[in-house]
């Protein structure tokens, strides 16, 4: 909801693209203004000391959660509110376009889909700007351990669920294990498995420029494109209905689907959508609920009752 309203503000100002840091800053201010994460028993004169940090941490959690879950049908990307673009792809587009005879838009979209595959694995963080707690990682990634990418996932680390491999991995018989990035490159460029695997290695070395064996993306290396403006484009698969801002030769962004893309305006189409109505709502005030049982100490019961009468607590 906060990101929706923040994107609306940028849209109204005609801002087609903003940095992740700028969106985090604006979202932090939104949470502060709404006191969305203020504790019910924090004195008014102490809010200025605690609210900015709490609001900023929740802004980062919201952004990272949206990035990792962008494929969901209820995501802000699927509703055309915004999309994500990896800035490190900027310098690779021209060479990629020339090497494979692609249109510039196709080249960019294919590179973006590769970067997004890394994001969807959960190997992303806020870099030096913020460190997620284990509880926050559990909320976003369903695991308390930070997820990482390695160039090749071997049999030795196969049981490490927090590690994802990037390039293709071969079975003992010489055949490759399924790899969605290889499949994507083979379909879009007509490459063999070995050539697709070599291209993934090249991307790892020259775009990710990973300096350590275990690697995670920095969310600050992305820009956010604001939807609903002439510069934003979205597409929908005629077969499966998936919505994407990435169009490679009109192929569905899902490697499991053979559908064809068509131009689509998800932001306008979401007017009657249940989730869109929730996101558009301006109600971002905190809801305080406390358990009121006989097991509580008498002074605690009294404190809750008084707070409820004073409307500091919404429900007992």
Task: List each model region and its residues.
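Helicase motor interdomain insertion/brace
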Residues: 1-312
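SF2 helicase motor core recognition
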Residues: 315-316
């Amino acid at each position: 909801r906060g990101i929706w309203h923040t994107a609306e503000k940028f849209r109204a100002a005609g801002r087609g693209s903003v940095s992740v840091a700028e969106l985090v800053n604006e979202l932090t201010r939104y949470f502060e203004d709404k006191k969305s994460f203020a504790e019910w028993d924090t004195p008014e004169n102490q809010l200025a000391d605690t609210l900015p940090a709490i609001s900023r941490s929740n802004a980062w959690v919201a952004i990272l959660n949206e990035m990792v879950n962008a494929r969901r049908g209820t995501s802000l990307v699927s509703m055309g509110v915004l999309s994500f673009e990896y800035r490190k792809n900027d310098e690779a587009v021209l060479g990629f376009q020339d090497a494979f005879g692609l249109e510039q838009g196709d080249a960019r979209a294919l590179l973006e889909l590769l970067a997004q595959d890394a994001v969807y694995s959960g190997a992303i963080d806020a870099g030096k700007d913020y460190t997620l707690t284990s509880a926050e990682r559990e909320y976003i990634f369903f695991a308390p351990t930070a997820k990482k990418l390695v160039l090749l996932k071997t049999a030795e680390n196969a049981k490490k669920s927090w590690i994802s491999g990037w390039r293709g991995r071969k079975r003992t018989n010489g055949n490759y294990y399924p790899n969605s990035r290889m499949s994507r490159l083979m379909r879009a460029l007509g490459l063999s498995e070995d050539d697709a695997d070599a291209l993934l290695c090249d991307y790892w070395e020259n775009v990710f420029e990973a300096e350590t064996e275990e690697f995670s993306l920095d969310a600050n290396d992305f820009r956010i494109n604001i939807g609903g403006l002439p510069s934003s484009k979205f597409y929908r698969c005629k077969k499966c209905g998936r919505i994407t801002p990435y169009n490679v030769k009109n192929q569905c962004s899902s490697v499991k689907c053979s559908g064809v893309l068509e131009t689509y305006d998800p932001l306008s189409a979401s007017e009657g959508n249940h989730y869109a109505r929730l996101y558009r709502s301006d109600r971002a005030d905190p809801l305080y609920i406390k358990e009121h049982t006989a097991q509580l100490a008498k002074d605690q019961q009294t404190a809750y009752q008084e707070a409820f009468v004073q409307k500091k607590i919404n429900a007992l």
